């Protein structure tokens, strides 16, 4: 057997973030107050483990790159803001999403359909949506006697706005009276997007998928005839509030958005037959149909955080699950969980960041530091065998299929690794009912490389 040649991980050309920490736990050299050990909260919903706390999501993904956003490719950073509109209105210093009028109307229709399914009549639905989607002032809120602060735009931003086309007038509608205000009052802060404690809201999530579609109803709507807050809260049990409350976070309040709308106005001093000029403005409204993004953990990632690090508590129907129950539940959901987790635990303990290798036909992909910094170095196939290398294979290979998989891995600059988990011949299925069985497991790694005759001849000639 030839000796394996280890290649250095290939760093990505462009890196857009800094490396924080390999794991979401404090290390011995960290003595600052902010480095306290923290228990994160997750829920098991529809055979999936999801994290809903905003700070928990940031910590778990930012430190160790655990999980992925259910609406994003990797980091949970989903936003409904239109990138083209955000670039067009770049002079508006605001953290509120900017969307088109058509996109906002889609959300109004989704909210309308949701309330119809709850049994509301058409007049009640129309009344609720009319009141909820009225134009508002940008959400400056008084906090403990503080007056709202309006920070003007910088001169640089003003000059950039003046250079726009003459037919596009930048304005913002404020107040229910239809008044118009200039853009100098749109510099909002992140804490201005939630109303004060005096505004009660109901958040209802759709059970159809993990994408939390929510409709919010202000307290004033309870005074509308034939409509009560309980009507919008009939499905609260489908998405229990326990996770956000356990995590120490309150329910998200209203989400404010800026909608680009068009106005028609006659040009001053123009002839009657001159065409109308279209002016565009930004209108602040409440989003009637919110979409929440959560962090979804693989079963291996969730169990590693709970068992190996002890920093994750997983709840099912508001009840915390023990380590043994998690081991049994994950095995019932995914029959190959024991095998894949042992390999995941092994590679994580060695400093690699394992991710699902389904894209390249393997079980795991191994990254150095994390996907934002390096390309995956290895594609891993996992097999559980006894000490005689016998047993039922999870994935039997023929020479043809193995050569094809090796060719695929080589074409994407990854090495194919066979990871053999060797258990004693005396170990029974009953012995594997708890994670303590991992103490008796040995691991052997085999790197598979393709022999190329022409390359071998050139190497021999050089020698």
From Swiss-Prot:
It holds the Pfam family tRNA_int_endo_N. It is found in: Nucleus; Nucleus, Nucleolus. The modification Phosphoserine is found at residues 32, 147, 406, 409, 413. Signal peptide: none annotated. It catalyses: pretRNA = a 3'-half-tRNA molecule with a 5'-OH end + a 5'-half-tRNA molecule with a 2',3'-cyclic phosphate end + an intron with a 2',3'-cyclic phosphate and a 5'-hydroxyl terminus. GO terms for molecular function: lyase activity; nucleic acid binding; tRNA-intron endonuclease activity. Keywords: Lyase, mRNA processing, Nucleus, Phosphoprotein, tRNA processing. One of its GO terms (cellular component) is tRNA-intron endonuclease complex. GO terms for biological process: mRNA processing; tRNA processing; tRNA splicing, via endonucleolytic cleavage and ligation; tRNA-type intron splice site recognition and cleavage. Its EC number is 4.6.1.16. It comes from the Eukaryota. Constitutes one of the two catalytic subunit of the tRNA-splicing endonuclease complex, a complex responsible for identification and cleavage of the splice sites in pre-tRNA. It cleaves pre-tRNA at the 5'- and 3'-splice sites to release the intron. The products are an intron and two tRNA half-molecules bearing 2',3'-cyclic phosphate and 5'-OH termini. There are no conserved sequences at the splice sites, but the intron is invariably located at the same site in the gene, placing the splice sites an invariant distance from the constant structural features of the tRNA body. PANTHER family: TRNA-SPLICING ENDONUCLEASE SUBUNIT SEN2 (PTHR21227:SF0). This is tRNA-splicing endonuclease subunit Sen2.
